[in-house]
Amino acid sequence: MMLEGKVAIVTGAGGGIGREIALAMALAGAKVVVNDIGASLTGEGETSATPGQQTQAIIEQRGGQAVVNTDSVSDWESAKRIVKTAVDAFGKVDIVVNNAGILRDQIFHKTSPEEWLAVINVHLNGSFFVSRAAAEHFRAQGSGAYVHMTSTSGLIGNFGRPTTRRPSSASPRCRSPSRSTCSASVCAPTASPPSPGAA
């Protein structure tokens, strides 16, 4: 299997695309950290471990291994705990899929600073925080892969979604002993080894 022996963190894996990515990685042999705060699509309201537990149950029913983490990507200390969950449960981390996102449907002149910052904190800061927390492990083991998700709202815009355009189009570009290749609306890890002297 392509990902046999690998450990993957998938943020926003309690449902939708994130769940499908987590399931696909598990089917390919990876052990998966299912990260999801279990809130609404807007990121508001009560949080719950249930969505993540449902993804975990499907993976385990299919013979895979997974653990659930409910920390938020939008906070540095929280993001470090997400990576720590992988290391504590499976001994390492090989793949980070930055999929977590929230939605604020609002036309620009009605978007509040709080709405703007909420999206920036999840989409942009969250991608940086989780990637940065994993980067130290990637450097130490000399390998790793990032997958950064975006949407058509981030690439070409969408009426009523000004908060999504900027953070999605500003996904991190990384230069480390890991690789990430971005094209169209999905980013996928490359199979090439790190170039000598990559910083």
Which residues does each PLM region occupy?
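A glycine-rich helix->loop->beta "capping" turn
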Residues: 62-65, 85-98, 104, 143
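Canonical Rossmann dinucleotide-binding motif of NAD(H)/NADP(H)-dependent dehydrogenases/reductases
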Residues: 3-34
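Substrate-binding pocket helix/loop in short-chain dehydrogenase/reductase
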Residues: 59, 107-108, 115-120
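Residue(s) in the substrate-gating loop at a strand-loop-helix junction
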Residues: 151
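The beta1-alpha1 cofactor-binding region of Rossmann-like NAD(H)/NADP(H)-dependent oxidoreductases
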Residues: 49, 70-84, 113
